[in-house]
């Protein structure tokens, strides 16, 4: 039954959606697909430019990856394509390793994603802390804004100055700020105003479309000297073609860290988008199949001139709001973009760079989650705030690879510290006949019996709690009550073995009370139960105390 459930997780949602498909839903899917394509067009171009590649690469990604991920995906409504989350990391890879380096890293990331899906890792993404995803998402938003300041203000850099890192871009921006263009600022400001106001005026039309149109008209008919996409890139309306890069072991080795980061980021973004979509349509996605589809989509995108892709929350939400309910909508979105590529791509060269920067400013604002960021700073535990700020700062100052790696390690260490603080060992209060005002329910114990109650998980971070157990010379029997110990690892087991040796050297019998299932399995498998003696493991404290009293009686 479990195996059948896992196999169902690897079934494309398209096959399920087509079972009860009808003409009415087809019309809705086609309409939604066309609308989403209109939204995706300027975004794909802008995100491609932010990623340091040509504008057509963004369209290729939305076409190829978008189609494959919709056809094979585990979500009925997911729309995939280039996203802002990848912009800075892709730009860094292209600057350092060129397009072939990016293609290799993306293909490897696709392989990782497929393996993650086949190994049923879809549910494991939930173990990545919310503070890390919020931290690096906010960090990416800041890096996007910093990266677009140059084009928004029309600043010119001296020949040979091509900053790659975010800090280098910020330094170059301020050093050359005197070269800013008022014309660029006017176009960028108007575009930004349209992007902000359009949602309130044009309910059904994405703000990026009128912003692009107005930007083109301003540059075309007003005496404004502003750089356009056509000034910086060669525009082509040819369809994507297959390109397999030459690669060797050295190139593959260099690409592995970036590939891992792309894979993890794609998994997080896509599954987060699926969860949001599930809430909007009251559905249930198949996380493992979605990862496989993301992998296949990224491999296809890389081979056909695209960049890394993942599920896009904004485009997915637009698909749902416009009636899309099956993967057909995502496939129509890709087909529509093919038509747009052939017919309208030459006009893309007329789009002003300040307009592209304005679009990316809004994208960055929408993804930065600043309200969540501030809320966490105000209300989260100190350890979570440390992880949040560390991940955010490392994303901005260094890159996403460093941020995720150090963020995860730091989160794990702080979690271990927190869990170790929850584990404690308490000695039972010793009472005798001379102790006044003793509660009737307390059991008076012989002096020779000592009871310690352990609370919390016994693992390597809390193993030293065993050292708090004090063995008196007059003790004949030591009882460890473990009803509140849910887990035990080998480090803590080693500490218990050392305690056993101390007890043996002093002639003390060690008795265990109420050992839970997981700790008992560890003890049995390691031979610890045989070492202590099966008779010294009791189901509850009453049985353990009775057993201890028999041991004392026998010793007399």
Place the predicted regions along the sequence by residue.
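Transmembrane helical cores of multi-pass ion-transport proteins
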Residues: 5-430, 474, 495, 527
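Active-site-adjacent beta-strand anchor residues
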Residues: 80, 512-513, 538
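Generic hydrophobic alpha-helical segments
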Residues: 90, 170-173, 466, 470, ...
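Short secondary-structure boundary/hinge segments and terminal tails
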Residues: 296, 337, 521, 540-541
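The feature marks cytosolic C-terminal regulatory regions of anion transporters and related permeases
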Residues: 366-531, 549-555
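Short acidic-hydrophobic, aromatic-tinged amphipathic segments that line or gate anion-handling sites
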Residues: 531-547
